[in-house]
Amino acid sequence: MKTPLTEAVSAADSQGRFLSSTEVQAASGRFNRAAASLEAAKALSAKADALVNGAAQAVYNKFPYTTQMEGSNYSTTPEGKAKCSRDVGYYLRMITYCLVAGGTGPMDDYLIAGLDEINRTFELSPSWYVEALKYIKSNHGLSGDAATEANSYIDYAINALI
């Protein structure tokens, strides 16, 4: 899994050199932000159920047809609603992984790589997940540096969807 730190080390090693002062400075900056990232990951994990349920409800409110149309990709049944919550939870989990890793590697490797194909195959609308992520961003309750760190990965996920 790639992170800015592993990328810097890999580049230096492949070139047979020590880390440059710029690379060391970037690593130092990451370590300075690490406490806020870990705080955000912990808070999002603790609130995961409430955030996921609220985000799913936000999708149903904005796109009421998702609870009215028949089909396995809609939320007309308890199973369909469970799938929606599972998918929203997966996005939230990837965000917490990115916060812990200090980079977008987990999301790039485990989510974004096949996102278009999955959405197309299962006829899932990216706008549903954008709405869910906007809800999470507006309701996570974080502030300060922890909010800044979390919001950067939420925005990254949103931008991958649009």
Swiss-Prot record:
<keyword id="KW-0042">Antenna complex</keyword>
<comment type="similarity">
    <text>Belongs to the phycobiliprotein family.</text>
</comment>
<dbReference type="Pfam" id="PF00502">
    <property type="entry name" value="Phycobilisome"/>
</dbReference>
<keyword id="KW-0605">Phycobilisome</keyword>
<dbReference type="GO" id="GO:0031676">
    <property type="term" value="C:plasma membrane-derived thylakoid membrane"/>
</dbReference>
<comment type="function">
    <text>Light-harvesting photosynthetic bile pigment-protein from the phycobiliprotein complex (phycobilisome, PBS). Phycocyanin is the major phycobiliprotein in the PBS rod.</text>
</comment>
<keyword id="KW-0602">Photosynthesis</keyword>
<feature type="binding site" description="covalent">
    <location>
        <position position="84"/>
    </location>
    <ligand>
        <name>(2R,3E)-phycoerythrobilin</name>
    </ligand>
</feature>
<keyword id="KW-0472">Membrane</keyword>
<keyword id="KW-0157">Chromophore</keyword>
<comment type="subunit">
    <text>Heterodimer of an alpha and a beta subunit, which further assembles into trimers and the trimers into hexamers.</text>
</comment>
<protein>
    <recommendedName>
        <fullName>R-phycocyanin alpha subunit</fullName>
    </recommendedName>
</protein>
<dbReference type="InterPro" id="IPR006246">
    <property type="entry name" value="Phycocyanin_a"/>
</dbReference>
<keyword id="KW-0249">Electron transport</keyword>
<keyword id="KW-0089">Bile pigment</keyword>
<dbReference type="GO" id="GO:0030089">
    <property type="term" value="C:phycobilisome"/>
</dbReference>
<dbReference type="GO" id="GO:0015979">
    <property type="term" value="P:photosynthesis"/>
</dbReference>
<keyword id="KW-0813">Transport</keyword>
<dbReference type="InterPro" id="IPR038719">
    <property type="entry name" value="Phycobilisome_asu/bsu_sf"/>
</dbReference>
<dbReference type="InterPro" id="IPR009050">
    <property type="entry name" value="Globin-like_sf"/>
</dbReference>
<keyword id="KW-0793">Thylakoid</keyword>
<dbReference type="InterPro" id="IPR012128">
    <property type="entry name" value="Phycobilisome_asu/bsu"/>
</dbReference>
